[in-house]
Amino acid sequence: TSENGSLVINGEYKLTVELAGLTLTNPKDPAIDIECSKRIGVILKDGTVNTLADGKGGTHKGAFYTEGHPEFEGGGTLNVTGNTKHAICAEEYLQFKKSTGAVNIIKAVSDGIHCGKGKQNDDNSHFIINGGVITVNNAGSDCIDADDYGCMYINGGVLNLNVSATDGAGLKCDSII
């Protein structure tokens, strides 16, 4: 538990991060910042509750940020608050596997979950849900956004999307859902 900390990983290879009862707030930057453009396994350890939040007014893209493609799994719970921009931001695709527990976006200034770099020419910005219960509340823009001509694949799981922004969407996609 830390109210003034972060996990920063720089790498060039696939990696796995296990969250097992983590409470992490960074008042200036992302709580988790993974600077690796490969596959990032994110295990939510069964029976644990993990809470992430970033600070207000920074320039970062999310409380949980990765350059690569996170694949969430495990029966735990992840609660994320995005006080600067997005709650969860992946510059490539993002996947919730069949074994994923619960992911709760408590609040986000912009998108609850954002996939993409914002370059409008990258078609690797997909949102994939195969399982889990994903809940997005209090998003300042869209609940889930697959940018850059990305697609959305909804193969299972549960999406609870509570649109609160006047011009926001539950699911926003530049290509096909």
Task: List each model region and its residues.
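A composition-driven surface/loop motif
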Residues: T1-I177
